[in-house]
Regions:
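Extracellular glycan-interaction surfaces
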Residues: 71-96, 117-127, 142-205, 229
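Chitinase-like catalytic core of GlcNAc-active glycosidases
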Residues: 13-85, 201, 265-400, 490-493, ...
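Single conserved hydrophobic/aromatic residue that forms the stacking wall/gate
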Residues: 1-14
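Aromatic-rich beta-strand patches that line glycan-recognition/binding surfaces
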Residues: 65-70, 117-118, 127-139, 191, ...
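Glycan-binding loop/region signatures in secreted carbohydrate-active enzymes
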Residues: 46-47, 60-82, 264-267, 276-277, ...
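Flexible glycan-contacting loops in extracellular carbohydrate-active proteins
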Residues: 198-223, 248-253
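Extended recognition patches within non-cytosolic domains
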Residues: 69-77, 86, 226-267, 498-500
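Short surface loop/edge beta-strand patches of beta-sandwich-type extracellular domains
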Residues: 91-115, 162-169, 241-247
């Protein structure tokens, strides 16, 4: 814990002094929603504990980021300030190579079945077999995008499968090309033409999920500018300089602009850039708060089942916390379901605490159907955020919220370590929608917990239900409230904000005479 974090608006429990009357107001930041301005500085500033969900584990314990930092290493690649009407470009000599690292077109969450690659290209000499990009496993092709044997022919190889396309003239001047791939179908966009050209040839439905380097420009002779890789099918996105203010662009995995002559391989879109922007936004907010790394998904069950991987995972998390100045870490692994998985989860928590030491804030998010970790693991955590909502509709009402809290306490989780979760979204049982969508759609009441949106009736928590839950937390001396999440609430400057209600109740109960 950080004992210095005390202030008039601060609601932080001191685990060494549980008599302090204060409440944790915890919520999650999803980087893509922050980037498209769905999460304001004011809403983040209202929280005392912020979790930036950005990472996931591999089975071997290594940590990957959802939006990897792909700063490229250049070999025999030169930077040109201007060339043939474009500024800030890179030149390849045929013996050049740009290595974008091992973070692209594979994931700890599974194989890619769609992606896009786009770039501006100036071909000095057509070279049969020159690579625009490739990923190799030794001598075996994972994926490769190459020039063909004849001018204006290109080929895409995935494993041993090959598809080809014939393009308009690319041999003179600058051209934009955008490759898209989705479940075996590949298409190419050229220049300003909105009609894609289809590749001919059968391709597999996904890219082999092998972690190897993403290499650009091997054997290529010419220039590149504004190169990107996206997890979506957005072949035309790179025609104009990319700005990260819309959903499609938020899914761009790497963007090399080549504008910085001192660092031409700089990746202009990464989890770290988002982190820096979050910190900048928080600078103007009053009070103190923690900003922590959130880790979710990935191959967490495999990692937790292996003692060596658990140790490596804990060590890597510690390094990330120290290198990037996080205030701690949160586990959001959903969820252990049997005795073996509970044992592994508990062992991972204990290993993480041992590695981090006492004073790094460490929490885990569990659920009423999955919370029975060991007493030693409970003791190792600063708090447990308890997801008292979804996916079943029956989890949303106030009465169930009370029952779920009581069940956790009866199991042995102390109230001063239990941060009760509330939803900022609604559910039909199979569909979900954001509370802010209800408000923007015309939600008028403050005390009804159902709303019909786009023909479907959703159960959610109204302002009055959130207020009732917040008061219960305060009066029953739970540690605080966790909300999912800031992107799905209406902005806190709006009187219909659910976060605003929580903040008001916490401030009153922390200072009842004021």
């Amino acid at each position: 814990i950080m004992p210095s974090l005390v202030g008039s608006e601060m609601c932080i429990r001191d685990r060494d002094n549980p008599t302090v009357k204060s409440f944790i107001n915890c919520s999650y930041i999803r980087g893509d929603f922050f980037e498209i301005n769905r999460i304001s500085a004011a809403s983040m500033g209202a929280c005392t504990d912020l979790i930036y969900l950005a990472a996931r584990p591999y089975a071997n314990g290594e940590v990957a980021f959802e939006l990897p930092l792909n700063d490229a290493t250049m070999t025999n690649v030169s930077h040109a300030g201007t060339f043939q009407g474009r500024n800030g470009v890179v030149k390849f000599e045929g013996t050049s190579l740009m290595n974008g690292g091992d973070g692209l077109l594979h994931s700890a969450d599974g194989a890619f079945n769609k992606f896009s690659f786009g770039t501006y290209i100036y071909i000095s000499e057509w070279v049969d077999g020159a690579f625009l990009f490739k990923k190799m496993d030794g001598n075996s092709t994972i994926i490769a995008f190459q020039m063909g044997a004849t001018a204006n022919s290109l080929k895409l190889s995935i494993g041993s499968s090959v598809a080809t396309v014939t393009t308009p003239d690319l041999a003179t001047g600058w051209h934009y090309i955008g490759l898209t791939y989705e479940q075996g179908t590949a298409k190419l966009y050229v220049d300003t033409n909105n009609t894609a050209i289809s590749f001919v040839g059968a391709l597999p439905n996904e890219v082999p999920n092998t972690r190897t380097d993403f290499l650009i420009g091997d054997k290529f002779k010419g220039y590149l500018d504004e190169t990107f890789v996206s997890s979506l099918v957005v072949g035309t996105s790179g025609r104009n300089p990319i700005t990260f203010d819309n959903w499609n662009n938020s899914k761009i995995l790497a963007y090399w602009k080549y504008d910085d002559a001192t660092k031409p391989g700089k990746d202009s879109h990464s989890w770290l850039g988002r982190l820096n922007n979050i910190r900048t936004a928080l600078q103007g907010q009053q009070g103190d708060r923690r900003l922590r790394l959130g880790i979710a998904g990935g191959e967490w069950k495999k990692m937790m089942a292996d003692a060596t991987a658990r140790t490596r995972f804990a060590s890597e998390v510690k390094k990330i916390i120290e290198q990037y100045d996080f205030d701690g870490v949160d586990f959001d692994f959903e969820w252990p379901t049997n005795a073996s998985e509970y044992n592994n989860y508990s062992a991972t928590v204990i290993q993480m605490r041992s590695t981090l030491g006492k004073y790094v804030y460490f929490t885990a998010s569990l659920h009423p159907v999955s919370f029975k970790i060991s007493p030693e693991a409970i003791d190792a955590l600063d708090f447990i955020s308890y997801q008292c909502y979804g996916p079943a509709v029956m989890r949303f009402p106030y009465e169930q919220f009370v029952k779920d809290g009581e069940a956790a306490v009866a199991y042995g989780i102390p109230k001063n370590k239990l941060v009760m979760g509330v939803p900022f979204y609604g559910s039909t049982g199979s569909l979900i929608a954001a509370y802010c969508d209800f408000v923007n759609d015309g939600l008028a009441t403050t005390n009804e917990d159902t709303y019909t949106y786009k023909g479907n009736t959703y159960t959610f928590n109204s302002i009055e239900t959130i207020r009732k839950k917040a008061r219960y937390v305060c009066e029953e001396d739970y540690a605080g409230i966790m909300s999912w999440d800031l992107a799905t609430d209406i902005d806190i400057t709006n009187n219909k904000s659910l976060l605003k209600v929580i903040k008001e109740e916490f401030e009153y109960y922390a200072n009842p005479t004021e």
